């Protein structure tokens, strides 16, 4: 590939926020911009798998940020293995097609998910060290060997505490952008995938209306500056995409409480509080037949549309029905007081 391509994933960036990002808006003015339909569920792992493969969740198999591994009864989140994607990612497709034509294709994958074992030439990803005594030490993993250490020697230690947890914020995004700048300058991959998570923190902590979105977007735009400059110097095309946007919600959904009150979820008490017991939880049994699933869906749809009909007659009135989709986009599940009645009906 004579012209390198840089794909920057700026989760949370939407059309309405672009005016706060002059550099990124400049890309749109020079090129184009189009709406991107979100996947369901609109979560990181699912969205990234769709962007990498062009497939929907039922095709690539990444249906959430976490999986229940039935063999061990464990729920594991934020898995990094590229083998979890049950469809061919773009870098694998490009390498195969290039080889068929007698050419080569190189790719750098920087902080995108499903990085371990990916068929890429350069990768950097968050990967803590876990000790035999249960200790955890923050760190990053890179391929080829020595890449992560080389980048940290030039850029400083990756600020892992700002990538996950209560201190999550701008420093990690700035570091990743500078990391991508170094990789693009030094190796000039045909495809560089860069994940910049800055807009995924405050809107989830405080809500959109509780966050200074203008400031956050300007910070993201500033963090992109060295990468965009290097892309221009390298003659690379830049595309910017987003996983999903954020909206305010006014109600809370507590499915685990409803499942527990219905006797479908069990927990094990211990010194660190209660821990989910998947083996004792009928919600994880996975023994449903197509006939029973159809019966559950029929009951759900009957109650749902009945509730929606009632709502349509009282558009400005109180919420009616135990399950409904609000015109404002919120999702309402059965209340705690109604959960038992719901389960009795589908039984």
PLM features: residue spans?
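Active-site-proximal segments of metal-dependent phosphoesterases and phosphodiesterases across multiple
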Residues: 206-221
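Short secondary-structure boundary/capping segments
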Residues: 22-23, 123-127, 207-211, 253-261
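Structural motif
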Residues: 7-9, 191-195, 239
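Short, structured active-site-proximal loop/turn typified by the sulfatase FGly-forming signature C/S-X-P-X-R
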Residues: 15-59, 108
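Active-site environment of divalent metal-dependent phosphoester hydrolases
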Residues: 16, 200-202, 247-252
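His/Asp/Glu-rich, glycine-adjacent segments
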Residues: 55-207, 283-285, 292-347
